[in-house]
């Protein structure tokens, strides 16, 4: 099933679209729910309800995992189901599973890397092409690297959520976005990166 409030009368899958989440939640044949809504509300309620109903959940929702991941992982463990969120960091580059499983016996002292492709593109343009921030951002938007509303990227929110997820898995204690000083790149000038 696909939960969507819109109608798709011409779709060959129109009988799979539902407007009531309980249809999905109460169907014993559904064992995995994929959340693609984003944000916290109503995603959190749907994901939590799915886990409590004994259904595994797959999501790429960074905000949900960063803010509610510890609770949702605990519920999944208690219910004997999976809560998968590999695509929430690195667009599916395998980092979550290795941190959670393969590297769990290792002591991790530091996490370093490029956490946001949009800001990396913008900063690279500023450094290599001496572009002003606004011009580099507009270029990123024109090429499809930046959203029309790029605030989550350029204000550091996206990177903050990702580092919370990675730090929580690496250091064994949930790290919340509110506890991380977050500063974006909007005030950086070409002179700053020269």
Residue map of PLM features:
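N-terminal glycine-/serine-/threonine-rich beta1-alpha1-beta2 phosphate-ribose binding loop
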Residues: 1-52
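Conserved beta-strand termini and adjacent loop/short-helix elements that scaffold enzyme active sites
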Residues: 5, 20, 86, 178-180
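General beta-strand structural signal in soluble alpha/beta enzymes
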Residues: 17-18, 35, 58-60, 83-87, ...
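Rossmann-like NAD(P)H-binding beta-loop-alpha module
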Residues: 30, 77-146, 153, 157-158
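A generic structural signal for short
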Residues: 34-36, 60-61, 124-125, 152, ...
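Rossmann-fold NAD(P)-binding glycine/threonine-rich loop
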Residues: 37-53, 60-102
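Substrate-binding/catalytic subdomain of NAD(P)-dependent oxidoreductase enzymes
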Residues: 135-194
């Amino acid at each position: 099933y696909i939960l969507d409030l819109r109608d798709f009368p011409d779709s060959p899958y129109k009988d799979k679209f539902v407007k009531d989440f309980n249809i999905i939640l109460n169907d014993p044949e559904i064992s995995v729910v994929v959340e693609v809504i984003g944000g916290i509300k109503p995603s959190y309620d749907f994901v939590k309800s799915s886990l409590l109903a004994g259904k595994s959940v797959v999501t790429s929702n960074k905000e949900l995992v960063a803010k509610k991941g510890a609770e949702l992982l605990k519920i999944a463990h208690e219910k004997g189901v999976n809560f998968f969120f590999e695509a929430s960091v690195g667009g599916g580059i395998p980092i979550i599973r290795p941190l959670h499983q393969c590297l769990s016996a290792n002591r991790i002292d530091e996490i370093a890397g490029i956490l946001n492709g949009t800001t990396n593109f913008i900063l690279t343009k500023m450094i290599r092409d001496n572009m002003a921030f606004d011009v580099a951002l507009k270029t990123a938007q024109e090429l499809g690297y930046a959203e029309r509303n790029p605030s989550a990227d350029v204000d550091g929110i996206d990177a903050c959520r990702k580092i919370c997820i990675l730090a929580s898995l690496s250091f064994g204690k949930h790290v919340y976005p509110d506890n991380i000083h977050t500063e974006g790149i909007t005030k950086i000038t070409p002179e700053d990166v020269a």
